[in-house]
């Protein structure tokens, strides 16, 4: 599915942000990526999505170079902000995004997904009238409706209500059941413990080897304690 090999990247005077990072996201698996702020998580995601130019290493998606049209239409990136065009209705936004991915949105299916997330009929209103949480839900609804081979979730659940949080957990697992893959970048360890198959830690620009989430929970009681231990081990 997604293969990242020996990727290094820096921002001029700031020096290297990523140092020989490698990561594999298999088909029908959910991988959680954690790490402190500034560790390079968003930089890595931007490289995968070709927002930043790759200078060293390689990234392939579905066996294709990440810059190819085939690779790009296989990835759905749901970011941490709520930047969605306020001049469109929810339906217009979803249907436009679907066309960009080469699929046709079904109005009734979109309506059902919005209703599932407590937004009955909202899809026909301008996004300008949406609250922050509603905009986040709209972004997530797009991911659940488009069924891309790989969905990257980058702190997207911040700001949604608890009912929507549980619905997202359910939808993530359904996506995996359909053979789709996910990369979830989050500080929400409860979310990662409920949904992910593997966890990787990105710290100081270096990626840890993936560990099964279940083994972390069984061995440490949860991701938080495992992270604390790993942090102490890394201190000089």
Q: Which ranges hold each PLM region?
A:
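H-loop/switch region of ABC-family ATPase nucleotide-binding domains
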Residues: 186-187
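The feature captures the beta-strand-to-loop junction immediately N-terminal to the Walker
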Residues: 34-36
């Amino acid at each position: 599915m997604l293969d990242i090999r020996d990727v290094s990247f820096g921002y001029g005077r700031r020096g290297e942000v990523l140092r020989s990072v490698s990561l594999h996201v298999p088909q029908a698996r959910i991988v959680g990526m954690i790490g402190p702020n500034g560790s390079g998580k968003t930089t890595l995601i931007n490289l995968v999505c070709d927002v930043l130019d790759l200078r060293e290493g390689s990234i392939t998606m579905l066996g294709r170079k990440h810059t190819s049209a085939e690779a790009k239409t296989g990835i759905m990136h749901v970011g941490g902000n709520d930047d969605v065009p306020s001049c469109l209705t929810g339906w217009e936004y979803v249907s436009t995004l679907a066309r960009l991915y080469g699929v046709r949105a079904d109005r009734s299916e979109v309506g059902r997904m919005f209703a599932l997330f407590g937004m009955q009929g909202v899809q026909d209103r301008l996004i300008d009238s949406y609250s922050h949480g509603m905009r986040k839900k709209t972004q997530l609804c797009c991911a659940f409706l488009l069924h891309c081979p790989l969905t990257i979730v980058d702190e997207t659940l911040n700001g949604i209500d608890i009912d929507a949080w549980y619905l997202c957990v359910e939808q993530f697992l359904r996506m995996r059941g359909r053979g789709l893959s996910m990369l979830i970048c989050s500080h929400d360890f409860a979310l990662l413990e409920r949904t992910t198959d593997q966890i990787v830690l990105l710290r100081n620009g270096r990626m840890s080897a993936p560990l099964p989430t279940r083994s972390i929970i069984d061995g440490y009681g949860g991701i938080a304690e495992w992270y604390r231990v790993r942090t102490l081990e890394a201190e000089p």
